[in-house]
């Protein structure tokens, strides 16, 4: 809840981390270092390699350890009664904390850019339906961010697919880019500022190169990116433009489901909510074609928190699980026995919510992915990649 005297403890924490780093007091954490490396690098081969290690092997190994720990009854008591953190936890305790909820599975094997062959950082990808004229197609600039592009690439692809469906011309940044927020919040303000400045210069070059396109909307699919991109002064890059979450944009375009049989939804609003123009519950309910209740509380993933401080993450998840179970009970109060899905609009939250599946039986998904599944069909991803790679991508030299 907000501080009664309006102190932003997020800003205070970032300032403290920067101070500790400058004084040489910041402790090294392997999980944080690995995550920052994955988010910062731009070379496609390195991204592919780290993605393979992290997802194909790392996530799979964590899932096997979770099953082993559960079979040996090492994790049940800790999850049911998470101990308070009063001192530095023992290594054994932290390992159990790290494996007590399974990582998500069935993630796409390749990043969104790799699937579309647009990894070259000297080329600006412009994606549009070739059947539409320039006058019929509104140009938007989509900044996918790390979570929607490198990790949960189905989110970035679903965003592009829905933009394609509503007739938008989608301009993507050249190459893999991070917004700079993770570095800033991790205590490396200088690195975060350098990334922000480099990106702004790059986007000015994009705007000059594509000055024949009248870009009036910048789209994001991540709340953390939204918070950072609000500092980019996009109105100076694309004059008269606005910054919108993909779900807000789709709501404006009249996209909605006509009621999904056998499924009911809850909405988890991220701590870094990306929806700044419209109320998140209004957007979610409009898009899903039915009233969607809010499921409160932090999911406990919080970027790298679940890796760097799994003990605290376990405590946060304990309270979130209570909220999920309460929400499920309310949705089933009238005897409904169909599927319950919890929707979100943050890549980190998608990972965090997916980890409750064995305990609550709920499936977690992104709103835009759920829209793509129902409006474009179960095979929407392969269909979109095929359409995009067959004459829908213009590669403009930067």
Predicted regions and their residues:
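Ferredoxin-like iron-sulfur electron-transfer modules
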Residues: 1
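Iron-sulfur cluster-binding electron-transfer modules in prokaryotic oxidoreductases
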Residues: 10-398
